């Protein structure tokens, strides 16, 4: 990717988008489009068309689309599905119409079948039923992946797709209702430590296994793929190891300094039993994550303790 080229990140303000923006600036990219649309505006075709008409981005990172943990998927399945469908269609079509050289679309590991051989390879996509707790969201993310493939076939465009493991890091959504597992556990344990609670209750059995990639590493992988990949098949982006939710919770408790009991509530849904990606294609290309899970958790908690709580208080004051 030419660092002199114009680059658009949709959505720049999200967890991955903000890390990607910072990384591009560090690399010396001089034309990261400074007129970004917020995630909510990406659902408006005319506004997306207006941005592409003005800025004419040569490279597009399609990161946008609402997401959340099991709670958010249970509470707002239609919102999550519709938002992602609209964002995908609007950005992909405008990238084609306005001559974007290359587009990278980020799907989600939720698009894999609920019961699938581990580690999950792209050949197993569509080979079984999806996890019911996030099926609407997963269908929308699958649609974006296949839309990129269809555009490649019909219009001969360089639209590629990647499937990331669970991404976490500074700037994540730490709300207890809608956040992903790491952000939710960090906040729960931090508040329990401050208020001297004796225990923290965690959804599910603690048995499901998950793979996690730090946001800085995910941003690095996005740029690597933009530079080195142009295939029709999606590429998995993971670290090659997974942890049970119990192991994760114990590690977060240590990082946060919470010394109380961890109580798992098996009456709450677990989601998929395991989600470990087969990232051998990316590894053979020469990419590796730089941050261990523990290092990433330390950086994330330091950010949350210093900035995240203040941001949440500011948001509450506005509401």
Task: Report residues per predicted region.
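Conserved catalytic-site region of short-chain dehydrogenase/reductase
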Residues: 69-70, 105-121, 136-142, 154, ...
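Conserved catalytic Lys-bearing alpha helix of Rossmann-like short-chain dehydrogenase/reductases
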Residues: 85-91, 140-148, 182
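Glycine-rich "substrate-gating" loop/helix at the edge of Rossmann-like oxidoreductase active sites
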Residues: 133-137, 165-180, 204-216, 239-241
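Conserved beta-loop-beta element that borders a ligand/cofactor-binding pocket
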Residues: 102, 107-108, 145-173, 183-186, ...
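Adenosine-cofactor binding site in Rossmann-like domains, unifying the SAM/SAH pocket
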Residues: 31-50
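NAD(P)H-binding glycine-rich loop region in Rossmannoid oxidoreductase-like domains
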Residues: 45-84, 97
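C-terminal substrate-binding subdomain of Rossmann-fold SDR/epimerase-dehydratase oxidoreductases
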Residues: 10-11, 15, 19-27, 191-319
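Conserved Rossmann-fold NAD(P)-dependent oxidoreductase catalytic core, especially the SDR/UDP-sugar
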Residues: 89-134
